[in-house]
């Protein structure tokens, strides 16, 4: 089924407003261990081993090696495990560098008056469905959200910004993460064994009188990620709303759905003449859910003014490069 057809016939997904970080925990990032002094077989040593395993998610053999190396000190053992995983991740990332990453996920996160879209890529759709890859997307979304919320500009109108791959890499990881996002990326590569990339992010922040509508298509549900929404397409639509509107969330979702399905290049004007299926201005385009009217004709009686939008399609840059 085509994207347009599926958008017209399937219900619109609801999005959440907040998310909590879930730390990316590699399960078994390295395999060869050298012999070392053995741990005591006492009950306390076994308890330490179990606790370290639960806390970090690493294998028993690696947790045992960490405790032996660090003389049974739990905090030092945890730090040692993360350091070893980091080394393995960077080593594997260097080996896999250059392999194409045309799969992946779009992540949408909204909190109060702020919304972010991020794109993280991998080599295969199979890995994109792995919860550890999805936790990486969450870390990127949370890091972008923190970056946006730390901006202290006093808003009289909306604010919109973009981050490229190198800018994303330098951001701090989410609240429960360690180091930068590029460190989290290396851990994920070491764990899952595929090349990955932090492709891009967009953020929108609005004052009173504005609203950010959103939509993600091809949504994937993952309870551990709470209100982060994942999919293959995503859109943010910035609307001005001078009055209180009861169905504003529904209108915002429908506008986001239209942006995903019709891929406009600009907003246009309510005065623009309709241009049919080839129209690239948003407002004079045929409305996705009712092509007998334009989007502008749908929006006008709703009491909102569309002022801007952002649209992400997973892997679109890679697809264009391959076509060329």
UniProtKB/Swiss-Prot annotation:
GO terms for cellular component: mitochondrion. Residues 1-44 form a transit peptide. One of its GO terms (molecular function) is translation elongation factor activity. The modification Phosphoserine is found at residue 269. It is found in: Mitochondrion. The keyword Mitochondrion applies. The modification N6-succinyllysine is found at residues 75, 132. Keywords: Elongation factor, Mitochondrion, Phosphoprotein, Protein biosynthesis, Transit peptide. GO terms for biological process: mitochondrial translational elongation; regulation of mitochondrial translation. The keyword Glycosyltransferase does not apply. Belongs to the EF-Ts family. Associates with the EF-Tu.GDP complex and induces the exchange of GDP to GTP. It remains bound to the aminoacyl-tRNA.EF-Tu.GTP complex up to the GTP hydrolysis stage on the ribosome. PANTHER family: ELONGATION FACTOR TS, ELONGATION FACTOR TS, MITOCHONDRIAL. This is Elongation factor Ts, mitochondrial. The gene is Tsfm.
């Amino acid at each position: 089924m085509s994207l347009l057809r599926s958008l017209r016939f399937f219900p619109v997904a609801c999005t959440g407003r907040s998310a909590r970080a879930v730390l990316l925990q590699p399960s078994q990032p390295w395999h060869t261990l050298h012999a070392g002094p053995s741990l005591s077989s006492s009950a306390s040593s076994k308890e330490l081993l179990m606790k370290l395993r639960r806390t970090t998610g690493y294998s028993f053999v690696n947790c045992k090696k960490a405790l032996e190396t660090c003389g049974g000190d739990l905090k030092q053992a945890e730090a040692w495990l993360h350091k070893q995983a980091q080394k393995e991740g960077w080593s594997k990332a260097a080996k896999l560098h250059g392999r194409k990453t045309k799969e992946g996920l779009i992540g949408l996160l909204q909190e109060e008056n702020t919304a972010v879209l991020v794109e993280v890529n991998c080599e295969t759709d199979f890995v994109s469905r792995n919860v550890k890859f999805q936790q990486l997307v969450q870390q990127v979304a949370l890091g972008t959200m923190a970056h946006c919320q730390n901006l202290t500009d006093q808003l009289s109108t909306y604010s919109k910004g973009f981050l490229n791959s190198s800018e994303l890499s330098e951001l701090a990881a989410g609240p429960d993460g360690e180091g930068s996002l590029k460190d989290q990326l290396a851990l994920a590569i070491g764990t899952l064994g595929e090349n990955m990339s932090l492709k891009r992010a967009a953020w929108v922040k609005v004052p009173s009188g504005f609203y950010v509508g959103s939509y993600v298509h091809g949504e994937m549900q993952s309870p551990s990620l709470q209100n982060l929404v994942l999919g293959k397409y995503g859109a943010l639509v910035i609307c001005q709303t001078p009055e209180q509107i009861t169905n504003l969330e529904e209108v915002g979702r429908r506008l986001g759905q239209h942006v995903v399905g019709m891929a406009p290049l600009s907003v246009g004007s309510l005065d623009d003449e309709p241009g049919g299926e080839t129209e690239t201005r948003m407002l004079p385009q045929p409305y996705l859910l009712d092509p007998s009217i334009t989007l502008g004709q749908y929006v006008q009686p709703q009491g909102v003014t569309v002022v801007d939008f952002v649209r992400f399609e997973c892997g679109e840059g890679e697809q264009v490069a391959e076509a060329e």
